[in-house]
Structures are given as structure tokens and as C-alpha cells.
Regions:
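The start of beta-strands in P-loop NTPase/AAA+ ATPase cores
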Residues: 30-32, 194-195
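C-terminal cap/substrate-recognition subdomain and adjoining C-terminal extension
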Residues: 2-3, 124-134, 142-243
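Alpha-helical substrate-recognition element adjacent to the catalytic core
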Residues: 2-10, 14-17, 21-31, 37-156, ...
Length: 243
């Protein structure tokens, strides 16, 4: 998001190289942590599909043309409706019903298959595996989304669970994302040495920086849930993985 553009250094890619250097030095005992949504996956195609289907149900032709570029933020559904041509007041009138429609679909195995890769992510993930360090995906997605998530990892040619990576998911959808990720910190410490952690959510990447003080905490300046959280000074922001 543009609010973090000022944090992205001209030589931001050096942080990614530094992670690989640490991974090569650590080998199999080293862990590199990645969130999924808006970190290695772009979920805007999923968001756009949901708006199109809502438009079909409501017979709103303008919404049936929704594409990822209609979103300025993946979480701003009302803004997408306005971008599609609905007057602001009419868009606001759909807010609650659309949110319910969205909630019944977004966090499902079927819909998450529509995600695509953040640019450069597949190549970078495979570069991490080449170092012999291990990847752990730590996501706020719940176990009911595992099948679709693994299918999407395969579609995007990313490192799969059991092939150099491990996938940690919330046991239940209702569990709070923040609490789950903090609980995962203990498991990560038991699995190995956390060398770096990548996450798009300021709250979550801050938690990694505070919990694993010797690790590189890397913020993906892509999209986030919109909570007004200031990034820790130790956190480095990058735009994507392509360099």
C-alpha cells in the first residue's frame, strides 16, 4: 500500500539476498517464515470473483465486470463498487449484505484457488529451499482451506508442504489471527532457528520482530487489513520478490 512506500529502500532487494545468505549458513536447522495472503499470494482475483457473483445475484450488470484493478485495497469492497460505477451512497447501501456474501465465500477452499502469486514469490521460495533451510507458511487461513491452499501453491509452482515446506493453519475459522500467530511462535522456536519472517500485516510482522530479535522481520508493502499499526523500526519493507 502507498502508505508504506516511503519505507522501501532503493536497494530493498539486498534484504532478500541477506535472508538467503543467512539460510545458506544455517542449513536445515534454519527456518524462513512466510505468511500467505498478500505476502506470497495476491488474493484480488478471489475478491473480484466474489463481487462479480454478488452482481449476478443482485442483477447489477456493472458489478459483473469486476476485475482486480477495481480494488485500491483488497479489504475495501465499497470502494470497488464505486470504481465499478455505483454512486457512493448506493455502494454504501450494499455494504452489509455484500460483506455477509463475501464472508461466506472468501474463507473457503474453493475460492482461495483463484489466488495468484505475488510477483517473484515462486522463484524466491525455491531459492530458499536450495539453501537447505526450511520454509514454514504461517497463515491465518483455517484448516478447512488446506486443500484449496495446497492446490493454489501447486498452481503457482510454489514450494509445497512436505517438499521443503510446512503449512501451519488455524485449527478453526473463528480463532483470532493475532492470537494464533503468537501461539505459532512457540512451535516455530521448537522447530528450529527462525532466520527471517515475511508478513504483510504490520501487527504480525511487528510480533515477529519482537519475538525473534535475531531474525530479519520483512514487511510486504502490498495490502493489509487497515488497522492503524506503526511498523517497528527493526522491520524492513519490500514491495515484492522480483529482482
Amino acid at each position: 500500500m502507498t502508505e508504506f512506500a516511503h519505507r522501501i529502500a532503493v536497494d530493498w532487494h539486498r534484504t532478500l539476498d541477506q535472508v538467503l545468505e543467512r539460510a545458506r549458513a544455517a542449513g536445515p536447522k534454519g527456518l524462513v517464515i512466510f505468511d500467505l495472503d498478500s505476502t506470497v499470494f495476491d488474493n484480488l482475483p478471489r475478491q473480484a470473483r466474489i463481487v462479480r457473483e454478488y452482481g449476478q445475484q443482485k442483477h447489477l450488470k456493472a458489478l459483473e465486470t469486476c476485475q482486480p484493478f477495481h480494488f485500491t485495497s483488497g479489504w475495501d469492497l465499497t470502494g470497488a463498487l464505486v470504481a465499478l460505477g455505483l454512486p457512493p451512497e448506493e455502494a454504501k447501501g450494499h455494504q452489509q449484505e455484500l460483506k455477509r456474501f463475501w464472508g461466506a465465500r472468501f474463507f473457503t477452499s474453493d475460492y482461495c484457488r483463484d489466488d495468484i502469486e505475488i510477483v517473484g514469490a515462486p522463484r524466491y521460495l525455491h531459492e530458499v529451499v536450495k539453501t537447505k533451510a526450511r520454509i514454514v507458511y504461517v497463515t491465518g487461513r483455517h484448516e478447512g482451506m488446506r486443500e484449496g491452499t495446497v492446490a493454489c501453491l501447486a498452481k503457482c509452482r510454489m514450494v509445497l508442504p512436505g517438499e521443503g515446506a510446512q503449512l501451519l493453519m488455524k485449527p478453526k475459522e473463528v480463532q483470532d489471527d493475532d492470537a494464533f500467530k503468537r501461539t505459532a511462535h512457540t512451535l516455530l522456536a521448537d522447530l528450529g532457528t527462525v532466520l527471517a519472517a515475511f508478513d504483510n500485516e504490520p501487527m504480525h510482522v511487528n510480533d515477529y520482530a519482537l519475538r525473534f530479535t535475531d531474525a530479519l522481520a520483512v514487511h510486504l508493502a502490498t495490502d493489509h487489513s487497515g488497522r492503524p499499526v506503526k511498523l517497528q523500526d527493526a522491520v524492513v519493507s519490500v514491495p515484492h520478490f522480483a529482482y
